[in-house]
């Protein structure tokens, strides 16, 4: 797989989730407009005016952050290898995937955000790989919902980032092919069969690997093994 394929997948994936991002922006924009209208009509009180202004400022800052992070992730770039915080990347991905999670009635369980999970690689590419896995797990629970659990465990110089869903698992006949470029069991045009292959390509480029297995209680566990910092 070449870099061009990764960037094409990046544009396709973020084009797909732009509705969810716009939904997040709309939520904060409603706060801005609502409090702006309230300030126009309400009577006295410097305190109330200040409270309204603070709400507007907070919502505006959140909108700016969403747009900044989205632009940062979608922009093509040459990968770099540098230390970064996994928790920071994950918090940004939550915003991007929240709409899909809500629509699928999926609850996302995250590791302790205060845990010092630091790794070395390209943060944007790592985020792309993880986002592909998160959305894949969300789709595995389509129609019934469930819990998507993200974990992080340090072992022998590598972080094992796990994503466990509560779907039906992967058929043994399909399991050997899930990381093949273009392989998909879905018919929708938005599913190109490139999510897991791109994730594998990115993680391999970091000096790690990715694997998948069915869980005894049902569902699938995907593990991204990446170098710790």
Question: Which residues make up each language-model segment?
Answer:
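Conserved signal-transmission helix
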Residues: 1-12
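Short beta-strand/loop element within the Bergerat-fold HATPase_c
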Residues: 147-157
